[in-house]
């Protein structure tokens, strides 16, 4: 009887891990979409202010350059699963 309880506990833990992994994947997709939306907004703002180029945008991209390169690389776009 005790072994049946351990099996049930193991199954419950396994199901919980799978559910949390799926939820985390969806969370990451949502965060990526929000980041893309934010970048699009920044691009629109820059288009409106195209006469005044500043170095502020370079500072804004410092932490995101690697992320943008990964996001916009052709291999990621071809896979179709980046968002």
From Swiss-Prot:
Main localisation: host cell
Record membrane topology: Single-pass type I membrane protein
The keyword Ion transport belongs to this UniProt entry's keyword annotation: yes
Record note on modification: Phosphorylated by host CK2. This phosphorylation is necessary for interaction with human BTRC and degradation of CD4.
GO biological process: receptor catabolic process; symbiont-mediated suppression of host innate immune response; symbiont-mediated suppression of host type I interferon-mediated signaling pathway; symbiont-mediated-mediated suppression of host tetherin activity; viral release from host cell
Protein name: Protein Vpu
Phosphoserine modifications at: 50, 54
Function: Enhances virion budding by targeting host CD4 and Tetherin/BST2 to proteasome degradation. Degradation of CD4 prevents any unwanted premature interactions between viral Env and its host receptor CD4 in the endoplasmic reticulum. Degradation of antiretroviral protein Tetherin/BST2 is important for virion budding, as BST2 tethers new viral particles to the host cell membrane. Mechanistically, Vpu bridges either CD4 or BST2 to BTRC, a substrate recognition subunit of the Skp1/Cullin/F-box protein E3 ubiquitin ligase, induces their ubiquitination and subsequent proteasomal degradation.
Subunit annotation: Homopentamer. Interacts with host CD4 and BRTC; these interactions induce proteasomal degradation of CD4. Interacts with host BST2; this interaction leads to the degradation of host BST2. Interacts with host FBXW11. Interacts with host AP1M1; this interaction plays a role in the mistrafficking and subsequent degradation of host BST2. Interacts with host RANBP2; this interaction allows Vpu to down-regulate host BLM sumoylation.
The encoding gene: vpu
Gene Ontology molecular function, alphabetical: CD4 receptor binding; monoatomic cation channel activity
Protein family per UniProt: Belongs to the HIV-1 VPU protein family.
Membrane side Extracellular: residue ranges: 1-4
Record-level GO cellular component terms: host cell membrane; membrane
UniProt subcellular location: Host membrane
Taxonomic superkingdom: Viruses
Cytoplasmic side: 26-83
UniProt KW keywords: AIDS, Apoptosis, Host membrane, Host-virus interaction, Inhibition of host innate immune response by virus, Inhibition of host tetherin by virus, Ion channel, Ion transport, Membrane, Phosphoprotein, Transmembrane, Transmembrane helix, Transport, Viral immunoevasion
Coiled-coil segments: none
Record comment regarding domains: The N-terminus and transmembrane domains are required for self-oligomerization and proper virion budding, whereas the cytoplasmic domain is required for CD4 degradation. The cytoplasmic domain is composed of 2 amphipathic alpha helix that form a U-shape.
Residue intervals passing through the bilayer: 5-25
């Amino acid at each position: 009887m005790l072994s049946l309880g351990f099996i049930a506990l193991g199954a419950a833990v396994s199901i919980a891990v799978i559910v949390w992994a799926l939820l985390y994947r969806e969370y990451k997709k949502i965060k990526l979409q929000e980041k893309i939306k934010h970048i699009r907004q920044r691009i629109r703002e820059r288009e409106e202010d195209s006469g005044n180029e500043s170095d502020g945008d370079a500072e804004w991209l410092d932490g995101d350059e690697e992320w943008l390169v990964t996001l916009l690389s052709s291999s990621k776009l071809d896979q179709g699963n980046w968002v």
